[in-house]
């Protein structure tokens, strides 16, 4: 990481956290909840872990690489426009559109290669997850960690 930056240059990690979480119990037992869990499981089986199990290590990796002035912020990205707050509602709407437009692509390789599903099984599951993503009664959100740090001005 450090070798590609000039001294004093910054590196930032940000990622969409899976599995998603909920501010209440409305996510429990849904296809949306299952989707996040299965995506992480499939990625792990393919040797490419993803989601919060990776993003929780960003700070540690930056420290190990010698970065300084490391900062961290955690955001909540709603799964759809369920929040009452105007800004969060708009963010949720854009997030919902993003997920719906990419859902099949996100799932197909991971679920067929990582979990051994047939394409038809993925299609059925994607339809269920899509319905949950549109359901404003499910108060889900994706953790969105952002971690950044600076390459030292001089070598340690």
Language model features with spans:
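A short glycine-rich, Lys/Arg-flanked "PGG" loop and its adjoining helix->strand segment in the class I
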Residues: 1-10
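Conserved catalytic/acceptor-binding region of the Class I
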Residues: 10-101
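C-terminal lobe and adjacent flexible extensions of AdoMet/dcAdoMet transferase-like proteins
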Residues: 65-156
């Amino acid at each position: 990481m450090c070798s590609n930056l000039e001294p004093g240059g910054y590196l930032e990690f940000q990622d969409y956290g899976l599995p998603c979480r909920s501010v209440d119990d409305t996510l429990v037992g849904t296809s949306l909840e299952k989707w996040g869990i299965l995506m992480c499981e499939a990625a792990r089986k393919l040797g490419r872990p993803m989601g919060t199990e990776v993003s929780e290590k960003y700070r540690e990796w930056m420290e190990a690489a010698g970065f300084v002035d490391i900062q961290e912020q955690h955001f909540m990205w709603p799964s759809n426009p369920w929040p009452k707050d105007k800004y969060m509602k708009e963010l949720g709407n854009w997030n919902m559109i993003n997920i719906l437009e990419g859902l099949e692509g996100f799932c197909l390789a991971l679920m067929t290669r990582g979990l051994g599903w047939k394409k038809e099984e993925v299609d059925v599951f994607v339809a269920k997850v899509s319905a949950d993503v549109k359901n404003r009664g499910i108060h889900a959100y994706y953790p969105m960690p952002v971690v950044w740090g600076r390459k030292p001005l001089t070598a340690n």
